[in-house]
Amino acid sequence: MTTNRILNWQGCNNVRDLGGMTASNGYKTRWGTIVRGDQPANLTNEGWDALYQHGIRTILSLRTHGLEEKDHPIVVSPRSDIQVISVEIEDVTNKEFVEKWATSDLWGTPLYWIDALNLWAHRHAAALQAIAQAQPGGVFLHCKRGYDRTGIISFLLLNLVGVSLQDITADYELSADPVRDQLLAERNTNAYEVLQRTLAGIDLENYLLEGGMSQSDINAIKEKLLETNL
């Protein structure tokens, strides 16, 4: 398996492995356990082969149902041993949230994460629970572009296993673009400060427990994601 974080899966444009990052007690995050990216609907045959050879056996979609089907294709894996799971982590029927963020140019920045986390603990916990209970093999988690919803779940996962905020921010910024950076700068902030405020607002393990995860689910995440036999 490659130990390059940036992965070239033909048909996807924003794919990377969350392995190799320093976590609690000097442990490293395990390669091939969690891969984040954009929607796999456009993967070529070669792209699917690369995904499979990387060890992915579960695809976790974080996308929201009820949108136009042509813009929201259902991903069907060409491999029978790859399980596809859907956990919607946003509720587009929440008019107050949609009016505040979806009509704003800040929708594509982490500024909205605090509101999303406060509103939908059960949805975020369900996504992490799906990872904890996934069949053996790696998990590929995605939304449409691999930025926001995928970013939130990656943020929670990496915090849970003790990756530093600096490294989490660096991972987030691999998907950033100059426009979003400028939007933050115009508000006298940056990605690190926004993620710092987001993390300060929650006690993560209690947040997940109150959202419906069990302690065994949380432990399973840590066991899966941490390479402890160093």
Predicted regions and their residues:
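Ser/Thr-glycine-rich phosphate-binding loops at phosphate-binding pockets of nucleotides
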Residues: 145, 149-150
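Cys-dependent protein tyrosine phosphatase-like superfamily
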Residues: 1-140, 152-230
